[in-house]
Amino acid sequence: MKLPGKIAIMGGGSWATAIAKIVLAQAESINWYMRRDDRIEEFKRLGHNPAYLTSVRFEIKNINFSSDINKIVKESDTLIF
């Protein structure tokens, strides 16, 4: 079963990383807000969160990262904090 609508993960910690992995198992893609651009770039480069749950790998092509909280909120139907 695929989750309906566009889902956003808010935050870049261990909880957000774990929830993102679970949501991506049921959604084609997600929006993911992280406060720090350097963490976003490192995440994209490595394919995992560089600071939390580093063994959990992600398909980066399925994630729309942004440090612009307003953009993520506007582009999402559901927000997960």
Positions of PLM-derived features:
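N-terminal Rossmann-like NAD(P) cofactor-binding module of classical short-chain dehydrogenase/reductase
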Residues: L79-I80
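NAD(P)+-binding Rossmann beta1-loop-alpha1 motif at the extreme N-terminus of oxidoreductases
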Residues: M1-V56, I63-S67, V73
